[in-house]
């Protein structure tokens, strides 16, 4: 629901996430096994869903862990309440999340076109034209590298952002010629970066 969405946004904001993370939860995603995960209630407030559930079922269940302060989400929930008490409009935060998600969609479109231009996937390996890659904006380079890592390693989650940025910078500054990250082996051969599965 909307409250979960805003909490997810604030958690990722506190971790320094970029567009990918700040776009928060998507209404529909396809998992790596092909299953579609649909979240139809992201625009509904928790309090409204509770009222509907109580009206239909007569009661609702409460998760006691929601009050456990050792969990980050519990503390973020308290922060969200404080923001509301201070006059921050939660609906506008929700609108900002949608705007960021729209930006992510535009970047995804450009990244997909760029990958077709200078990344070749063959025999469980990716070969990236590093000269063309370097001409792209940093955010696009980051997203392309994430996409390659996920495609080759078959992992749902990519490595931490800072590690991917360091990888890109290392190869651009010719500090490294071969390394591993996110279940992949990266090796620079002349103007091309070869990416294979680590294990």
Give the residues covered by each predicted segment.
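AMP-forming adenylation/ATP pyrophosphatase catalytic core
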Residues: 14, 29-34, 74, 78-79, ...
């Amino acid at each position: 629901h909307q409250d979960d969405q805003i909490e997810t946004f604030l958690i990722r904001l506190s971790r320094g996430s970029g567009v990918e993370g700040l776009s928060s939860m998507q209404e529909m995603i396809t998992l790596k096994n092909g299953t579609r995960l649909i979240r139809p209630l992201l625009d509904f407030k928790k309090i409204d869903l509770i009222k509907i559930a109580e009206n239909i079922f007569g009661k609702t269940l409460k998760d006691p862990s929601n009050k456990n302060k050792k969990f980050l989400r519990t503390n973020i929930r308290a922060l969200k309440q404080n923001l509301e008490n201070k006059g921050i409009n939660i609906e506008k935060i929700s609108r900002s999340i949608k705007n960021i998600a729209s930006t992510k969609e535009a970047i995804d479109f450009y990244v997909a076109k760029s990958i077709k231009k200078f990344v070749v996937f063959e025999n469980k390996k990716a070969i990236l034209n590093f000269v063309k890659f370097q001409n792209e904006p940093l955010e696009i380079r980051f997203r392309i590298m994430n996409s390659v890592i996920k495609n080759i390693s078959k992992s749902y989650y990519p490595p931490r952002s800072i590690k991917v940025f360091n990888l890109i910078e290392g190869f651009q500054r010719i500090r490294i010629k071969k390394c591993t990250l996110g279940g992949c082996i990266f090796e620079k051969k002349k103007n091309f970066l070869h990416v294979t599965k680590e294990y």
